[in-house]
């Protein structure tokens, strides 16, 4: 019964039509199985027409989520209207953020395609097995990971964006390297969004401190690296 309820919540008629569009465009063949869930979205494992593994993120047409989205979009300078258009705008904003992060040199899923409330991106995993989140798999080199992740924060900042929700839950451990995921809370870098950048930095520093790393960069050092070239 719960599975049927989930199916109806995710695969409404609009989403089903959008999946058909992705299939006809050759971006995916079919949705093979779920690999991640959240309050506003589901992520499914799939393959493209050439057999390459991909992931498909579906933003749900959920009325509860919709109530929160207008303020979310307003904070990001996006005007929208209407239920479906607002969900689509939210999805487009996330895709563009993923694209910007990826192009700036951040290790993240490769952005492949976008249609309405669907995002197609590279699959982080191997042979249908998704990479585990860093909160579940902490078998990695502390020094290398810390250097990489702080570097990712700076690269995103210099490209004009902030992840906005950076934590070990949104970092995957694949091939012993960190991959950032879920850019749905990302923001444009301005003096007004500095607190979100500060929060990301502190989340990472606090996490690595718990893991036993001592020589951490300071919040101010990261802010100087980011804003120094933005002024």
What are these regions (language model features)?
Residues 145, 157-163, 174-231:
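C-lobe/activation-segment region of protein kinase-like
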Residues 93, 148, 203:
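Charged catalytic carboxylate motif
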Residues 2, 7, 195-196:
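Polybasic/polar functional segments that serve as interface/processing modules
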Residues 128-140:
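AlphaC helix of the protein kinase catalytic domain
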Residues 6-131, 154, 158:
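Conserved ATP-binding subdomain of kinase catalytic cores across diverse folds
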Residues 165, 169-171:
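Catalytic-loop signature of eukaryotic-like protein kinases
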Residues 141-152:
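Conserved alphaE helix
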